């Protein structure tokens, strides 16, 4: 598989371990690089979203965007943290974002996305210690894929 080929179809469900065998990336993070750093993987877990109150804003929006809360379970999230910064810089670096929904060890591919022109906003949500903190909410737009004949 070349670095430009994406082997997974929208709607396809597979084990997360198998996904990482195919394209690389970290097995446990919500945001990770893959394909030797040429793309990003983002995993949304509805159970985690509900636990931390992210479900109030996460997911598909009426305007077609997908909102995703950044990485970091304790204290204020920062856009300068490693994973959040990588996601924020993905558009400038030409890295596609491949979005998945997690359920247990299964992941379902939602599609290829990019950061919106208005890439993020701040919200308040509890951390894992039930203390309110600032979280970054990324705004993702479905990417148009150019086909070469």
Model-based region annotation:
Residues 2-108:
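Acidic, glycine-rich low-complexity segments with interspersed aromatic residues
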Residues 103-149:
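Compact mixed alphabeta submodule
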């Amino acid at each position: 598989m070349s670095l430009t080929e994406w082997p997974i179809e929208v709607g396809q469900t597979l084990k997360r371990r198998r996904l990482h065998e195919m394209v690389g990336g970290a097995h446990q993070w919500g945001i990770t690089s893959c394909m030797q750093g040429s793309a990003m993987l983002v995993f949304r877990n509805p159970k985690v979203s509900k636990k931390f109150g992210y479900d109030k804003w996460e997911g598909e929006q009426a305007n077609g965007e997908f909102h995703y809360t950044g990485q970091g379970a304790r204290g204020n999230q920062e856009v300068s943290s490693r994973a959040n910064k990588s996601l924020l810089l993905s558009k400038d670096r030409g890295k596609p974002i491949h979005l998945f929904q997690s359920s247990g060890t299964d992941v379902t591919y939602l599609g290829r996305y990019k950061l919106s022109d208005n890439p993020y906003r701040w919200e308040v949500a509890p951390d894992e210690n039930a203390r309110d903190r600032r979280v970054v909410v990324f705004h993702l737009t479905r990417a148009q894929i150019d086909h070469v004949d």
